[in-house]
């Protein structure tokens, strides 16, 4: 009986160590991924990537195509160094795309403050969701289907609003995106804590994309509500 208990304890301890290692490596790679994101944003601002705004639909489809291509490559190579390299590549690309909304924000007299506010809000969301997932030890995997449906609805609404250009719909999409992707951070980190995600490259990609979308959506809301022209 004692032998069985010892084996079970060792197995449980080993699983906990693996989960902690995946979580630690995810946070480390997530922090590193912010470097190419910032570099990409700086390059995009310098290169005036706003020219892509001339064709919103084509830009949207091009963005999705390149992003999904990166994500496919990362998942196929997540157990090798190439997966890490592709992950850093997509974060640089996302930084380039981020430069468009940053240029718009910097066009306001309080642009720097709005960007800082969005960054601070995103950080607060991340730390709150990460703490809940880690401390509560609850299994939030049941949220997955609902969050996926929510993400698809947001994607379709964003695509439709490219044609309709309804300001109120744009605000609603941004608000919904903040809620859905904040919940995705909770869901993704919970999967690591519960042992549902054992690859830190895949985990980093999921959490990074959620953080990115929370930041962009928060910035859009802040610009719409507090933006000041000279």
Each PLM stretch: what is its role?
Residues 1-230:
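A hydrophobic alpha-helical transmembrane-helix feature that marks the membrane cores
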């Amino acid at each position: 009986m004692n032998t069985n208990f010892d084996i079970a304890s060792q197995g449980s301890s080993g699983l906990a160590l693996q989960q902690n290692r995946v979580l630690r490596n995810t946070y480390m790679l997530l922090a590193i991924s912010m470097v190419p994101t910032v570099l990409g944003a700086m390059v995009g601002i310098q290169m005036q990537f706003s020219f892509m705004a001339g064709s919103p639909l084509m830009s949207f489809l091009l963005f999705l195509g390149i992003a999904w291509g990166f994500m496919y490559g990362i998942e196929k190579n997540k157990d090798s160094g190439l997966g890490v390299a592709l992950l850093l590549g997509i974060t640089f690309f996302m930084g380039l795309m981020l430069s468009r909304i940053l240029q718009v924000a910097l066009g306001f007299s309080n642009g720097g403050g709005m960007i800082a506010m969005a960054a601070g809000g995103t950080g607060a969301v991340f730390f709150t969701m990460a703490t809940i997932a880690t401390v509560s030890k609850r299994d939030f995997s049941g949220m997955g289907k609902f969050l996926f449906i929510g993400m698809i609805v947001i994607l379709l609404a964003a695509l439709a609003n490219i044609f309709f250009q309804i300001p109120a719909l744009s605000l609603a999409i941004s608000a919904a995106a903040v809620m859905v992707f904040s919940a995705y951070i909770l869901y993704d980190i919970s999967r690591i804590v519960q042992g549902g995600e054992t690859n830190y490259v895949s985990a980093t990609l999921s959490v990074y994309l959620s953080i990115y979308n929370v930041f962009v959506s928060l910035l859009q809301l802040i610009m719409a509500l507090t933006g000041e022209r000279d």
